[in-house]
């Protein structure tokens, strides 16, 4: 499989998924939109992954490329039916590109927190092998407030009703992070917007908490990756 990866910050890449892709002889190209990279045509790609980032989906004036990115996601998912995976901002962009709504969260989620599968999520192939409730890393202050028509909510948390979503048989997204590596928190904490959300000493506390859960995070990531590939391979 040849995957097109959209990134919005150099340090917010596919993380541990990269090692799984290399191991399994898949290939991928990345485009760094926040650095002014142009969006190439989707021809020749078998799937689209959209990663996280510090900007919000409505900040088109500050980040004009967001409009073109949303159009590309609509083309990829709704018209071409390409397999899709979106994380954090990528989750929100999928929702808005397909007609849903994203807004500021009433309560921001930052840190290691629990997510619970919905009944639909527990029955979904993408979450096969995962427990009904699991720990994950959250780092967001916006969320999907209305899913697009035809979407199904697969997971929720106390503060966020749409933690994971499926649209059609081929498109999946999650508000929470599953791509973590040992240096992820340190690297992301260098982004001013993320550092501000953490507050004084927050990066060190989050890094320690993430390290304590890293084995479980990585196991979950591999299971989700395996499931996604089985569905879309």
Model-predicted regions and their roles:
Residues 2, 83, 133-135:
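Residues that mark the start of a beta-strand
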Residues 3, 28, 84, 171-172:
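Hydrophobic anchor at the start of a short beta-strand
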Residues 1-78, 197-233:
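N-terminal beta1-alpha1 cap of cysteine-dependent amidohydrolase-like domains
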Residues 170-171, 175-210:
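C-terminal helical/coil "lid" or tail adjacent to the Rossmann-like core of SAM-dependent
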Residues 51-121:
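Cysteine-nucleophile active-site neighborhood
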Residues 20-23, 64-68, 101-103, 154-155, ...:
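Glycine-rich, phosphate-binding/catalytic loops in enzymes
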Residues 98-183:
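Pocket-forming structural segment of enzyme catalytic cores
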